[in-house]
Regions:
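Helix-turn-helix DNA-binding segment
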Residues: 293-304
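Structured, helix-rich domain cores that form ligand/interaction pockets
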Residues: 1-292, 306, 310-378
Length: 378
């Protein structure tokens, strides 16, 4: 049993036409931030619900934009969807993007690991192999520190090492994954009753230790491919606030960024057996990190090739073409910066929708544009 929740939600928004209503109080603070000149604490019926920072200091940022951070206790309330939509719509705050999102799952232990310390031991002794990034940080009781180029370990050696925290990714990573002992955090920092109440309502046993597996998404450098529609989805409020869509989103992050395998010594680690740590087997979404340059890595080529193979089977079975899907494939390859590769590999199989020919025509148009005189040439 695990409970999926939102633990951080910051919304990039247009507040240029903001008009606070009578039910909401926007209390302006006497200070701002390094990025925004103005800061407001927002209250609804006397309850503090959000912080709005706006009025960008830099001219490079769009005028009238800001960041709306929903306070942590609000994120665990039952009618979160209505609360956020009312806050934005009633006060004329327009959604632009999600600047930071932390999704978490709380549980008592991983499947197969009633003693969570055994999970840490199996990882550190390579009995479990994590697919993907190999740099990590492990923490236990803060007494002794050990550093090397690949990880930092903080712990106390007594009768055994007791680990409380494991992180993959850095503070600047577009996606970071954290596993930590939430019960220990309550002991060390502060107990949050509203989280404990959510546990009790969802059969999370607080008499045992409760662990949290959290994924933090920052900026707009990650998109999601809907594997049913083959369409791209950016992060949006429906995806986050609707419980069903939120679970699909979390499942996608778990399958991509918490992929552990039972190490049987195979050279190809991705062929080793999955370690089923949580009862999550599939998601209709697939996360893809956007680097900002032409993306030509092997994983994305494999994804496009898999789509092409599936489409071949559909065409053979139905003896007909799907122009909508073909257009989506074209859009996908352009989005990933793989038009030339796709045209060379698959262009010949399209009779009257020749991707190779289209790519060549686009190259010729770009060449013509490059030699056209500009205002500076005249």
């Amino acid at each position: 049993m695990h409970l999926v929740s939102i633990d951080w939600l910051s919304i990039y928004c247009d507040c240029s036409a903001m008009a606070p209503s009578k039910d909401y109080i926007f209390d302006k603070e006497p200070y701002g931030t390094s990025v925004f000149a103005d800061m407001y604490t927002i209250y609804l019926y006397g309850e503090e619900i959000a912080i709005l920072t706006c009025n960008p200091r830099s001219s490079a940022m769009k005028k009238g934009t800001g960041v709306l951070k929903i306070l942590n206790p609000i994120l665990y309330q039952q009618f979160l969807y209505e609360q956020i939509w009312n806050l934005m719509h009633i006060n004329n705050i327009q959604f632009l993007n999600i600047s930071r999102l932390d999704l978490c799952a709380d549980f008592n232990h991983f499947d197969g690991y009633p003693d969570m310390q055994q999970f840490f031991q199996d990882f550190l002794t390579l009995k479990l192999w994590k697919i993907g990034a190999a740099k990590y940080k492990v923490c236990a009781n803060k007494a002794v520190e050990f550093d090397c180029n690949y990880f930092k370990m903080i712990g106390l050696q007594s009768s055994r090492h007791t680990y409380q925290y494991l992180r993959f990714g850095s503070k600047v990573s577009k996606v970071s994954a954290y596993l930590y002992n939430k019960t220990q955090e309550f002991r060390d920092v502060k107990r949050k009753n509203y989280i404990a109440e959510a546990w009790a309502a969802n059969d999370i046993d607080e008499k045992q230790e409760v662990w949290r597996l959290e994924f933090s998404l920052k900026g707009d450098g990650i998109k999601f491919l809907n594997q049913e529609t083959k369409m791209w989805q950016a992060k949006n409020l429906d995806m986050v606030l609707d419980p069903i869509q939120r679970t699909q989103l979390y499942n996608a992050l778990y399958l991509k960024y918490w992929d552990f395998r039972v190490n049987d010594g195979q050279k190809r680690k991705d062929r080793m057996k999955h370690a089923a740590l949580l009862p999550i087997e599939s998601s209709i979404l697939r996360p893809v990190v956007i680097t900002g340059s032409d993306i030509t890595d092997r994983e994305q080529k494999r994804m496009i090739s898999a789509i092409e193979r599936t489409y071949d089977e559909v065409r053979m079975k139905r003896q007909t073409r799907n122009e909508t899907l073909e257009a989506s494939i074209q859009e996908l390859t352009a989005f990933c910066g793989l038009r030339k590769w796709h045209a060379e590999k698959y262009g010949a199989k399209y009779a009257d929708m020749d991707f190779a020919e289209q790519y060549q025509e686009e190259e010729e148009r770009r060449e013509i544009d490059r030699v056209q005189p500009t205002l500076f040439d005249q």
